[in-house]
């Protein structure tokens, strides 16, 4: 069948890659597994053999021909014909996720998943995206994505996947990543909405020092630039001058959390 290019369809065909993904998730007979993207069902079938139930979310009804074949043999598979970004994932009751994600929704679906209660997610990403997700501070790949994901989860690189594992072959390499939810973040965050805006402000200027980056992108935390500059030069935040003087990409995860919480308190106090 003809793949839907608008949906970024590249169907997984390599059974060895399927096996690696399932092994990384440590699937057992008690698991309820969420899969995003049906494809031709190669991953779905293997999951169904090993777990209690598979819940598949698929947008493209043209793939129904593969679904009809699957349900005849595996009655423990349920499908939701919808856009995964529009489905209330929290209502589905899964404890694990294994999926070959459409790459154009990699970022929004990852953060949507991180808001859910699950044990582990094993996901296929574009290789460069996977590198940024697990990057440590001080590296060129360290980004807003790195910070936002690693605050909420442990990221483990499973393996690189070549274009030959898919049909049609994508123009980029891929990678399987294992995401394990943390019981507690590295540093308790007072306000997650502010934290996300704070990170956007920082990493829009990752090579600048932290104070300049925040001032340049004050709008990301709903601040007037001059007002934020005044606060960042005030005595109240003086004890964090060393952090404010560091280049953004050198800040550790904990340093970002500490600075974020204290700036949040100072801003609220000034209102």
Curated annotation (Swiss-Prot):
SUPFAM superfamilies tied to this protein: S-adenosyl-L-methionine-dependent methyltransferases
UniProt KW rRNA processing keyword: yes
Residues where S-adenosyl-L-methionine binds: 12, 37, 58, 83, 100
SMART domains, per database record: rADc (SM00650)
Listed PANTHER family: DIMETHYLADENOSINE TRANSFERASE, DIMETHYLADENOSINE TRANSFERASE-RELATED
Family membership: Belongs to the class I-like SAM-binding methyltransferase superfamily. rRNA adenine N(6)-methyltransferase family. RsmA subfamily.
One GO CC term on file: cytoplasm
Membrane-spanning intervals of the chain: none
Compartment list: Cytoplasm
EC number: 2.1.1.-
Primary localisation category: cytoplasm
S-S bridge residues: none
Molecular functions (GO terms): RNA binding; rRNA (adenine-N6,N6-)-dimethyltransferase activity
Organism this protein belongs to: Methanococcus aeolicus (strain ATCC BAA-1280 / DSM 17508 / OCM 812 / Nankai-3)
Group of enzyme by EC: transferase
Protein name as it appears in the record: Probable ribosomal RNA small subunit methyltransferase A
Signal peptide: none
A UniProt-annotated Pfam family: RrnaAD
UniProt entry keywords in alphabetical sequence: Cytoplasm, Methyltransferase, RNA-binding, rRNA processing, S-adenosyl-L-methionine, Transferase
Role of this protein: Specifically dimethylates two adjacent adenosines in the loop of a conserved hairpin near the 3'-end of 16S rRNA in the 30S particle. May play a critical role in biogenesis of 30S subunits.
């Amino acid at each position: 069948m003809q793949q839907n290019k608008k949906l970024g369809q590249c169907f997984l065909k390599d059974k060895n890659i399927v096996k690696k993904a399932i092994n990384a998730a440590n699937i057992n007979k008690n698991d309820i597994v969420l899969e995003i993207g049906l494809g031709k069902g190669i991953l779905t079938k293997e999951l169904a053999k090993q777990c209690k139930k598979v819940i598949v979310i698929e947008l493209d009804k043209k793939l129904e021909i593969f679904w009809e074949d699957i349900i005849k043999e595996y009655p423990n598979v349920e499908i939701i014909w919808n856009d995964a970004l529009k489905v209330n994932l929290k209502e589905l009751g899964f404890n694990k996720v294994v999926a070959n994600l459409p790459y154009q929704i990699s970022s929004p679906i990852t953060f949507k998943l991180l808001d859910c209660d699950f044990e582990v997610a094993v996901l296929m990403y574009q290789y460069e995206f996977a590198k940024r997700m697990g990057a440590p501070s001080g590296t060129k790949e360290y980004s807003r994505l790195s910070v936002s994901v690693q605050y909420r989860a442990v990221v483990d690189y499973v393996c690189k996947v070549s274009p030959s594992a898919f049909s049609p072959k994508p123009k980029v390499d891929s990678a399987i990543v294992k995401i394990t939810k943390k019981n507690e973040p590295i540093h308790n965050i007072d306000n997650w909405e502010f934290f996300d805006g704070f990170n956007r402000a920082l990493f829009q200027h990752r090579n600048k020092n932290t104070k300049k980056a925040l001032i340049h992108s004050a709008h990301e935390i709903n601040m007037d630039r001059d007002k934020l500059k005044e606060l960042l030069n005030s005595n109240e935040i003086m004890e964090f001058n060393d952090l404010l003087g560091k280049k953004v990409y050198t800040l550790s995860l904990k340093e970002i959390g500490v600075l974020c919480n204290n700036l949040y308190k100072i801003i609220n106090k000034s209102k």
